[in-house]
Amino acid sequence: MEMAKEQELILVLDFGSQYNQLITRRIREMGVYSELHDHEISIEEIKKMNPKGIILSGGPNSVYEEGSFTIDPEIYNLGIPVLGICYGMQLTTKLLGGKVERANEREYGKAIINAKSDELFAGLPAEQTVWMSHSDKVIEIPEGFEVIADSPSTDYAAIEDKKRRIYGVQFHPEVRHTEYGNDLLNNFVRRVCDCRGQWTMENFIEIEIEKIRQRVGDRRVLCAMSGGVDSSVVAVLLHKAIGDQLTCIFVDHGLLRKGEGDMVMEQFGEGFNMNIIRVNAKDRFMNKLKGVSDPEQKRKIIGNEFVYVFDDEASKLKGVDFLAQGTLYTDVIESGTKTAQTIKSHHNVGGLPEDMEFELIEPINTLFKDEVRKLGIELGIPEHLVWRQPFPGPGLGIRVLGEITEDKLEIVRESDAILRQVIREEGLEREIWQYFTVLPNIQSVGVMGDYRTYDHTVGIRAVTSIDGMTSDFARIDWEVLQKISSRIVNEVDHVNRVVYDITSKPPSTIEWE
């Protein structure tokens, strides 16, 4: 994930906090590029990246636990501003000679702090509401530091070493519950780190096109095309960079939404004048998935088979060296790092065979979903395509829970088409981040006409979100839900019950598998 040297960068080091991706997002919202990296990154790597500032994230551990995460203390001697958040502040205190101890009880939730007017709190009121989440507490600050905020529960809510530009806060400025959190981060980024905030989709395109051209040269690239937003944006970006050196492979694996295959060929083959090949691999995928019910195994099989299909097509084309994918930053984060447990392996990052014959190109793997949409608009992709519903690489294969069969796929395909049609008719497409139907591996008793039925249950999932990292269930009007339910039960065979998922993320994920 190298950036051009002239690009301003705030480096976020990951200590396992559930909020660490939010830090990255908040910085980017200010027009400054930010990346999340493992805390074990070397000093040489940091120097090579040349960040304007470094943020140490929070984390669930105690700095005194055996094997607790740490950093090379030389980071503090690089002359680069550092901001430690919660665990990051406690670690900074410990490494620089202060004292930290286990608190009698964990402090979690809203708190009031009293802040002094300094660089970090410039222009902000003295009394502020913040969000605390920590089990350790600082009891003595290192030499050269002073207190810049306190609270009823701690004398050290925020500290600074003004000379070395090292800061620490015992709360989470990145979460919405912290009243002036964005302002504090903005002060760090702009006042302390002297960033100008010039990161835009326009200069992202310029940088990526140049990187693609330098890497590819006169060689050829295959793009994994699904018709979804991510792969569409990747295809258009690559086409803009290398033109006819790009061949798009659209694998129709039989796990697509209703009418999706024909739409992809029409929009991209004809509309964008791209070289696109449609491969009918339905039987191939269904044979591989026969008898498989474990979701992780399904994802791996689909990911592997995708690449094998590309291998076959590439051998026909000759001279293809690269495979392009629409991997997002959320895919990379959710697939796990050393500090974070894998939530689920993503098709784009976790299902690739070790004997793959391609070099990977993932030009949007540093972007969140909303940023990809902005990129798509900047590239000239029509809004109705940019705002299409997110669709996972494994397709309906992970929306049929348990073993996949043709009959089950048809239930999901038809019920999903009804859901999307009603949402569109009600004008809710832009209000809801993602919506789809799933088929849980359960049946229930019902009555249709004068007869007892024992048929499938369809689940509706609709969520609101900004970037897909967190979400809440959409508060769809009851009459609209009733309309959707009635149509599904009456128009889709072998369905006698419809349920609505009202779970947020976390604790659940958006997809059911």
Swiss-Prot record:
Residues 9-198 form the Glutamine amidotransferase type-1 domain. GO terms for biological process: GMP biosynthetic process. Its EC number is 6.3.5.2. The active site is at C86, H172, E174. It catalyses: XMP + L-glutamine + ATP + H2O = GMP + L-glutamate + AMP + diphosphate + 2 H(+). One of its GO terms (molecular function) is GMP synthase activity. Pfam families: GATase (PF00117), GMP_synt_C (PF00958), tRNA_Me_trans (PF03054). Signal peptide: none annotated. It comes from the Bacteria. Pathway: Purine metabolism; GMP biosynthesis; GMP from XMP (L-Gln route): step 1/1. Residues 199-388 form the GMPS ATP-PPase domain. ATP binds at S226, G227, G228, V229, D230, S231, S232. Homodimer. Catalyzes the synthesis of GMP from XMP. This is GMP synthase [glutamine-hydrolyzing]. The gene is guaA.
